[in-house]
Structures are given as structure tokens and as C-alpha cells.
Amino acid sequence: MINTVIDSEHTELQDVCLDPFLDLENEIDKLRCSKNAVILAHYYQSPEIQDLADFVGDSLDLSKKAAETNADMIAFCGVRFMGECAKILNPRKTVVIPDKEAGCSLEDSCPPEEFAAFRSKYPEHTVVTYINCSAEVKAQSDIIVTSSNAASIINRLPKDEKILFAPDHHLGAYITKKTGRDMVLWPGTCIVHEQFNERELVKLIVRYPGAKIAAHPECPEAILKHADHIGSTRSILEYVTSYDAHTFIIATEQHIIHQMNKLAPHKTIIPAPGADGTCDCANCPYMAKNSIEKLYLAMANEVPRIEIPEDIRTRALKPLQRMLDLSPNAASQNRNAA
């Protein structure tokens, strides 16, 4: 097995105790200028990181920004597969992530060797993979999709084309229901969306009878069947900010609520609960590994740095580029407008 490499030389720098009087925001701005760097952040990052970023968006938004940037360095505040996407699209640019351990349960659920064995059972199927997977799995794929564009891209494939979809089983089931396509599904799930609890959600609906429910399609069907709106994080954000309602229950990682509060401060936003009735399950532990301190160190020292073997990168580029070519214009949040 050839692994995607994260250059870990000097990664002990992540454990350095910084001067408590250091103005990290100012220092990051200096590095942004001196290194011609762009900071990309996912909606699931902490509010502090979102507010520092040049662009905030979902996976599709940020993939497009990574493909378009003229920066020499991309500091990707998300999880590892997102940094890999940036490197696949920009092999000559330096791509750093704040924490090398910021993985993804969906990526972990789909080891490249096991996926290769699985897809070998379906040689006549077009392999469609959700972007939440490793570069090695992307390299085995025919096309990449995100939750923003999965249904529209699959609808563009010939009706008689057989499809294998991985790694998110819940997203695959939702797309199957929405498009009517009979797909072979890999059994992966997201640890955040998997934990939302129907019983506790119904209690919340009873408590807030006028609330609208917005859910990410990575949620189980037991949650989705209660939703007034199902979509990607950006789609959920647009729904909350534009729909004429005052109260919303949000079934996705709760840091998206930061953007909702900025864009619609007059609305009441309630995170969907887990089995214990609290909203603690709505925090991604992998996204939470990143911090402003780690971002500063990553930009200053250019580690952890994403490096991908060229044969894997070139094979992964083809399905990723195909996705971008088939996707409408995305609209990530510009730092100056957020």
C-alpha cells in the first residue's frame, strides 16, 4: 500500500508553548502576506478560525477555491482529505493543515485495499465516490461528488449505467431515493450525523412546534424523514437565512450555526440532539483538532504539509476534475463579506 504522505518533519512544533502575549491573528495576517497564503476553512471549524479565513464554505465551495487560487500556500482548515484535494488540484503549491491527526470517520471506514476488493466485484459499475475519502480511494474512482452536487451529477449519468457509491451509506440511500437510481452502497457513516437521535428530535419538535428542521443527507433516514429541508451545509445555511421562519432545528455539525448567527442574528437556531438529549454529538472531533495556534505554527513552519505520490495524484485528479467540470458555480463565504 502506498500511503498519502503528510510530511511530519518538525511536527513536534505543534506542541510548542507559544508566547501568551503573541497576537496570533496579527501574526497569521503577516504570514498570509509574506508567504502569499490563502486560508480556507470549512463551516465545521471553530468560529475563531472561520473569522480568520479568507474563504469559508462546504467541500464543493472550498474545492473550487483551491482550484482557482493564485496563492503560493494553501492553509486548509478542515480535515486531511480536504487538504489532499487542494494538493491534487495544486501539485506545485505548498498545502498545510493545522493538525496531521485531523482525519474523518468516513475516510477511515473505507480503506483503499478493502475498497479495491469491493469494487472488483462490480467491474461494470461506474464508481462514484463522496469527496470524504482518501486520495487513494479517489484514484480508484470514476467521478467524485459532494453533498451539494451528488444528485445532480448522478442524474446526468445514463439511466442504464450501473453505479457503485461510497463511502457514506446514508448519503447514498438518500440519493437513491431522490434519483430513483439503484446503486450498490459501501457501508460507511459519519460519526457526527450518525448520532442524531429521532426520539430526542421529536421531543424538540414538540417543544418548538413552529420550528423548521434542516438536515444534512449524511443523517440516517429516521432523521431525514422529519426534515423540511435536506442539503449540504451551504444549502442549509442558505435555507435558514432566506426562509421566512424564525426558529430552526439544525441536524448537522453545529459550527455552521456561527455563520447563521452572523447572517441572520434575529433567528433562533437550535442544534439537533443526540440520544442523551444534548447537542454534544454535533461536534466533529476531527475538525476540533484544529486551532488558531496550530494554524499559526503550520503556516510559519510549513508543516504538517500534504504530499501525495504523483501516480496517485494524477489518477485522483481525473474524477475530481470531472466533478468540478459538472458542477455549477459555488458561492463560498468571502472573509471580507462574512
What is each PLM-predicted segment?
Residues 1-250, 257, 261-272, 276-338:
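Active-site loop-to-helix "anion-binding N-cap" substructures in soluble metabolic enzymes
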